[in-house]
Design a protein with these regions (language model features):
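The serine-hydrolase catalytic nucleophile loop
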Residues: 70-80
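Conserved alpha/beta-hydrolase
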Residues: 84-102
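Conserved acidic catalytic loop of the alpha/beta-hydrolase fold
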Residues: 115-135
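Conserved hydrolase catalytic core segment
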Residues: 134-176
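A catalytic-pocket lid/entrance helix-loop region that shapes and gates access to the active site
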Residues: 159-206
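Alpha/beta-hydrolase
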Residues: 192-283, 290
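Short beta-strand/loop motif that positions the catalytic acidic residue
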Residues: 288, 294-296, 300
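Catalytic histidine-centered segment of alpha/beta-hydrolase-like enzymes
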Residues: 328-337, 341
Length: 373
């Protein structure tokens, strides 16, 4: 039985990989691009995936979350976001300490935020030179949104606009709200052992990595990440796992590191986590020079929605919008993901109408839950 299951797994994995490579070959032969590159950023060889139907389209760089977790929006996302890649040349990056980059450099996890930011600036310079453009779009997800907003603040002349997905604003404040919510959640559902564990751990902040890891383990047993519908999670986590296991650019060891190994080691050994815990965009960034757009789940208890709204209300920007998704928590539901990608595509099309397609029946205005001018 074990041999049958193992054999079936490898057959399915090979079929998925062949499908992705076939689509990549088609793009590469019809004026587009789909490939993985090794680039030297800082002192380290790192990995990016580039995909798009037309290389004349604007460049969009994704900054994944974690820290140390390149899912979603690392190189395993190749062939996954066709709504975006039809309109942009999309770049996915496995950052220092994450995914394939971690697998190639497993001993180098004692890095700092400053190193990751320097890597990002080098990568943006590389992309601008490679595609002969002055500016690119930047898309930050979860912890990657801290890096994204700081880049917006520091190098606005190199960016068209910024999209913050599940935007981090003030981790300490969000974590304190999250702690209280977890207590209420576990008490109301009768999980008394988890209530006891939380109280024993105490309220954040957690200075020790071991305490933060314990809090994360407790958090993983809650509904803070995912909104549930009719007793089922409203996020296809299995699809994310399949995406990594089927990725033709990852060995099985690299797939394991992408899903588990890299984030675990990064949390234990790098300074990155403690540095991110000290972020306070409320005080740090009060004005930006480019348009900024944010999308968040209405039930995101990891990154406080009310905190995001308060910050954006005060933020000075040429244009700013907040899209609140009714069917999502920190992770976006399948239907809300589709809304986000169409929203991003429509906003980019306003600046690059040459790539615009026939409009959908649903307009951007109809899907905005909240609009801030």
């Amino acid at each position: 039985m074990i041999f049958l299951i193992s054999g079936g797994f490898f057959v399915m994995r090979q079929l998925f990989r062949q499908s992705i490579l076939s689509s990549a070959n088609e793009l590469n032969h019809t004026g587009g691009i789909s490939e993985v590159r090794e680039v030297l950023l800082g002192d380290m060889l790192q990995y990016i995936a580039i995909e798009g139907e037309n290389m004349d389209n604007p460049v969009c760089l994704f900054l994944h979350g974690g820290p140390g977790l390149s899912l979603p929006y690392g190189i395993s996302s190749r062939h996954q976001l066709e709504t975006i890649s039809s309109h942009c040349t999309v770049v996915y990056w496995d950052q220092r300490g994450a995914g394939k980059t971690y697998s190639t450099n497993p001993s180098d996890v004692s890095f700092t935020y400053e190193q990751v930011e320097a890597d990002a600036k080098e990568l943006i310079t590389y992309l601008r030179r490679e595609f002969e453009v002055d500016q690119i779009y930047l898309i930050g997800y979860s912890w990657g949104s801290v890096l994204g907003m700081r880049l917006v603040h520091e190098i606005p002349e190199q960016l068209y606009a910024y999209f913050g997905l599940s935007q981090v604003v003030h981790p300490l404040q969000s974590e304190q709200v999250l702690y209280d919510w977890l207590l209420d959640e576990f008490e109301s559902t009768g999980h008394h052992q988890l209530v006891s564990s939380l109280k024993q751990l105490g309220q954040p902040p957690y200075e020790q990595a071991s305490s933060q890891e314990t809090f994360q383990q407790i958090l993983n047993q809650s509904n803070a990440y995912v909104k549930w519908r009719e007793g089922l999670p409203n996020v296809n986590v299995l699809n994310w796992i399949r995406q990594v296991l089927a990725c033709p650019d990852l060995t099985l060891k690299e797939a394991y590191d992408t899903l588990i190994g890299a984030s675990h080691q990064t949390l234990k050994q790098s300074q990155y986590w403690s540095q991110l815990q000290a972020v306070n965009l409320l005080e740090e960034i009060k004005e930006v020079k480019i348009p900024v757009y944010f999308a968040t789940g209405v039930d995101d208890y990891i990154c406080s929605v009310s905190l995001l709204q308060s910050w954006v209300e005060q933020l000075q920007a040429p244009k700013k919008e907040v899209l609140i998704l009714d069917n999502s928590a920190h992770y976006f539901s399948n239907e809300d993901e589709s809304i986000i990608y169409q929203w991003m595509k429509d906003l980019i099309a306003k600046k690059f109408p040459q790539a615009e397609e026939a409009p959908d029946e649903t307009t951007v205005g109809e899907i905005f839950s909240n609009l801030l001018q």
